[in-house]
Amino acid sequence: MSPETIGPAAVIVLAAGAGTRMKSRTPKILHEIGGRSMVGHALLAARAINPLKLALVVRHERDRVAEHVTASDPEALIVDQDDVPGTGRAVEVALKALDAEAELTGTVVVTYGDVPLLTGELLGELVATHEAEGNAVTVLTAVLDDATGYGRILRAENGTVTGIREHKDASEAERTIREVNSGIYAFDAAVLRTALEKVTTDNAQGEMYLTDVLGLARDAGGRVAAVVTEDRWQVEGANDRIQLSALAAEHNRRIIESWMRAGVTVVDPATTWIDSTVTLDEDVRLLPNTQLHGSTTVARDAVVGPDTTLTDVNVGEGAKVIRTHGSGSTIGAKASVGPFTYLRPGTVLGETGKIGAFYETKNVTIGRGSKLSHLGYAGDAEIGEDTNIGCGNITANYDGEKKHRTVIGSGVRTGSNTVFVAPVTVGDGAYSGAGAVIRKDVPAGALALSLAAQRNAEGWVAANRPGTASAKLAEAAQELASTSSQFQATIEEGKQA
């Protein structure tokens, strides 16, 4: 449905189950697939059909689930299921809560919080069919090769739906039926309300079954029909980690295929993972073993990978990111990062800049064209444009109690193994010598040197480490040097004679 289309009166998402087979302290519906919780996927699909109201029924880990849902969808109505078990009761308490302001009329959709591949498009098809045919109940079904464990859809000779038979109650003949109940429905609100008043817990499980509504609606003269989807993945739930993994893999496959159709090159889809929240431009190239998570964006002509994981990172046009682990960072157009680089949150690399091999950065802004090529750390710092930071440079930003900031200007050139002891500022165009320890501000255009003149203690090894391999090698080298000097002196004497 388009954003302008008014959707059903309400969507009810059932999310009260404990999910014990997941064997986790995290509620089942909060487990993630493709960068979004399963209930997050359910809410996204529900909102896609523009319901006037949306309710979520909770029970297990109630406060934790409610907090998560409210953070992403503050307008969703949180409804608590009481001690009466069953899907029928869950829908009944939700309907009463939705009716509190004014009694609902029209279509009510019921879906689940653990069906992460369900799309708004399929829900929209369910609603459209339900309303076009004037049905009392429309059930979403799928045809499975192996229907073991699922409720079977029973049909009359003319094809109309007559009921649902749970697997444990089905006859041998009924168990050959491959069309199964997804548990996702569109109801006429008035029919649903009336039928729920008649649903009891008088069954082997002692629960209020939502499936009982179909028979009650049919007995009251209502039409019960089905929408059959050929895409079984959209109605698959995740009850344990094995099913969760299978759904995650299928979800990822679909995301990757959609991006490839949109002009993205994925060299090895089998080793590439992309969250549903990631944005890619045309002509992006993803190399093997690349993972893109969160709000990551990658602009046109950028190359990411191999062996790269980015979370909430913005990659500019034409940039290259190789064997890098990064989060909360920005990489400018035509910039270069890696290999073996660690970008921590707050890293901003300007256009055409470079962060090279074995570098760690955190909370640092690096100007256009500046280079931090290898073996260093830059944290809590600001580096200007066209500055070259030498090998082995670090910003010593922590004094044991507080973090301090280093500011390095534009056009600066630093020698290898320079240490900046923050807080310190280096002016534009300044240089530092190799091994310098910068404890004071360096004026623009100055050369900073901090090492004393070199002094060689002749014979120290022989005196302090006699008999060692080093001492023996030093003695041999000294003898060779002495012989060479004598030979050279003889040659010079011959020239003078």
UniProtKB/Swiss-Prot annotation:
Assigned EC number: 2.7.7.23, 2.3.1.157
Annotated residues for binding of UDP-N-acetyl-alpha-D-glucosamine: 14-17, 28, 81, 86-87, 112-114, 151, 166, 181, 239, 344, 362, 377, 388
Catalyzed reaction equations: alpha-D-glucosamine 1-phosphate + acetyl-CoA = N-acetyl-alpha-D-glucosamine 1-phosphate + CoA + H(+); N-acetyl-alpha-D-glucosamine 1-phosphate + UTP + H(+) = UDP-N-acetyl-alpha-D-glucosamine + diphosphate
Lineage of source species: Bacteria, Bacillati, Actinomycetota, Actinomycetes, Micrococcales
Organism of provenance: Paenarthrobacter aurescens (strain TC1)
Family assignment from sequence similarity: In the N-terminal section; belongs to the N-acetylglucosamine-1-phosphate uridyltransferase family. In the C-terminal section; belongs to the transferase hexapeptide repeat family.
Gene Ontology biological-process entries: cell morphogenesis; cell wall organization; lipid A biosynthetic process; peptidoglycan biosynthetic process; regulation of cell shape; UDP-N-acetylglucosamine biosynthetic process
Region (N-acetyltransferase): 263-497
Top-level division of the source organism's lineage: Bacteria
Subcellular location(s) per record: Cytoplasm
Name of the protein in question: Bifunctional protein GlmU
Signal peptide (residue range): none
Annotated active site: H374 (proton acceptor)
GO annotation, cellular component aspect: cytoplasm; membrane
NCBIfam families: glmU, PRK14352.1
Region (Linker): 242-262
PANTHER family the UniProt entry points to: BIFUNCTIONAL PROTEIN GLMU (PTHR43584:SF3), NUCLEOTIDYL TRANSFERASE (PTHR43584)
